[in-house]
């Protein structure tokens, strides 16, 4: 027998912070794997519950290494694990989740068979606090070329990665404290091949205290990650913003919320965008032109007279946008159509839409919210669910994406050729629930007015309609 023990093939690490109630299940799911060539690092991030006692009981197991540390947060801990790991492959298991018995065997087998492959991730089950399966996450098949747009990241945990590739890209970015999987995905997919397994190989726990429930923080962090990588790529994101206005006495352009005019607020918000170089207000209503007179000193806010025949309710905007693109679109890379109906959209949403389009190389992009509802059509004999969505539980149904937020952007060269705003490969940017609130009725006005009043009084400038 050799005096030198070979390094294990896989380094599994469990990160734990105050998850004593789930921790044993997670650790045991590693120790009972069908594949045995692994080491297990258990990293406790300064827990104050019974975690240390539970972890200590595994101290005599030769496969287990234990690291206790003061609270450092997830991304710092991920990098500590990478430095401590000796395996050819590395995989994280969160302390509130657990593996299927063949998880390590399946994922390492895929990587062993494909030396150029850098990352593999499986489908997974959703479970509740009592280990009841409440749904399944099913991904499109990377191996069968179902995936050509890499804008849906792998889960941050239970994804197996080739350790030397992970080191080459510098590990995890410690300036972010959540969305580690997304940040890594952006970096990793730029240089290495990734694939998935169609089998569910871990159990992901949905409960009130886990991070994924804080949607607004997640979306803001994703936007910051996108911005960071776009800054590195130095792409030309110059954008011409178009606000289409039909006009008429009841038009939103003439209305106010808490004393702030809706059109003025929208223009001022766009003027603060990193990428918007010109703002074109397009309307058949000549009063709108007078209304924007205060901006005349700014060379970048201009009026475009829109033919009345192109401003009817059922007419699409393509002819108008083509005219604007020809007249005002010199030297810009993108066209963005921004509607007035969504007053809680902020400049960060606009910038993130442009960044997302550039980062994933799509031709156009639209702002959306995922929607898991069941929709019906009337077929003359009663209601029928669309896409057989009644056959699935809520968590199994693949989300439909609902266009909300009033942001559509397209690369100018793509639009000039196709004369369609949503053209070529269409990307999406998810906006938060507040930003998706639109003005379509008196009740909407009341709700948005209340939100902005509350935010003005608590001085939360993020959701005040920008003046």
Language-model segments: residues:
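Conserved core of the sugar-phosphate nucleotidyltransferase
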Residues: 319, 323, 334, 343-432
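Acidic donor-binding segment of Leloir-type glycosyltransferases
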Residues: 27-68, 276-303
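Glycine-rich, basic loop-to-helix element that forms the pyrophosphate-binding segment
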Residues: 69-85, 314-324
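Short, well-formed alpha-helical segments that are part of the catalytic scaffolds
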Residues: 18-32, 252-272
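Conserved nucleotide-sugar donor-binding catalytic segment
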Residues: 143-225
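Short aromatic/hydrophobic "clamp" motif used to bind/position activated sugar donors
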Residues: 90, 335
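Conserved donor NDP-sugar-binding/catalytic core segment of glycosyltransferases
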Residues: 104-134, 330, 356-365
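N-proximal low-complexity "stem/linker" segments adjacent to membrane-targeting elements
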Residues: 1-29, 231-251
């Amino acid at each position: 027998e050799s005096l030198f023990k070979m390094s294990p093939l896989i380094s599994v690490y469990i990160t734990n912070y105050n998850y004593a109630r789930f921790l044993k299940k997670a650790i045991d799911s590693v120790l009972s794997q069908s594949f045995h060539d692994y080491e297990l690092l258990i990293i406790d991030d300064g827990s104050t519950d019974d975690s240390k006692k539970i972890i200590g009981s595994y101290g005599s197991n030769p496969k287990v290494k234990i690291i206790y540390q003061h609270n450092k947060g997830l991304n710092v801990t991920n990098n500590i694990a990478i430095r401590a790991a000796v395996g050819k492959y590395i995989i994280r298991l969160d302390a509130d989740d657990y593996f299927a018995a063949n998880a390590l065997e399946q994922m390492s087998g895929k990587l062993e068979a494909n030396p150029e492959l850098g990352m593999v991730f499986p489908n997974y089950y959703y479970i509740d606090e009592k280990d009841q399966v409440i749904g399944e996450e099913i991904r499109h098949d990377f191996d069968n070329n179902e995936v050509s747009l890499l804008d849906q990241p792998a889960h941050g945990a239970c994804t197996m990665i080739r350790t030397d590739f992970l080191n080459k890209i510098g590990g995890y970015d410690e300036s972010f404290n959540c969305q580690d999987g997304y940040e890594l995905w952006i970096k990793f997919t730029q240089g290495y091949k990734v694939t998935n397994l169609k089998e569910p190989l871990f159990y992901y726990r949905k409960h009130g205290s886990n991070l994924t429930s804080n949607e607004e923080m997640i979306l803001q962090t994703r936007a910051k990650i996108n911005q960071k990588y776009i800054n590195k790529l130095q792409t030309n994101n110059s954008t011409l913003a178009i606000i289409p206005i039909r006009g008429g006495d009841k038009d939103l352009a003439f209305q106010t919320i808490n004393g702030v005019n809706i059109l003025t607020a929208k223009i001022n918000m766009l003027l603060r965008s990193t990428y918007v170089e010109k703002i074109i207000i397009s309307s058949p209503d000549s009063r709108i032109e007078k209304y924007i007179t205060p901006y005349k000193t700014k060379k970048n806010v201009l009026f475009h007279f829109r033919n009345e025949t192109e401003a009817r309710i059922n007419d699409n905007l393509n002819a108008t946008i083509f005219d604007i693109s020809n007249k005002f679109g010199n030297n810009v890379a993108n066209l963005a159509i921004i509607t007035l109906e969504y007053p809680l959209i902020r400049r960060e949403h606009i910038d993130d839409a442009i960044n997302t389009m550039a980062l994933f190389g799509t031709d156009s992009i639209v702002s959306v919210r995922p929607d898991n509802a069941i929709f019906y059509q009337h077929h003359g004999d009663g209601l029928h669910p669309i896409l057989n969505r009644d056959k699935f539980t809520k968590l199994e149904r693949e989300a439909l994406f609902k266009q909300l937020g009033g942001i559509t952007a397209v690369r100018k060269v793509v639009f000039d050729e196709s004369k369609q705003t949503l053209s070529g490969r269409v990307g999406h940017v998810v906006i938060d629930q507040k930003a998706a609130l639109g003005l379509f009725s008196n009740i909407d006005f009341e709700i948005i007015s209340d939100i902005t009043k509350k935010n003005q009084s608590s001085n939360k400038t993020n959701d005040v309609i920008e003046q």
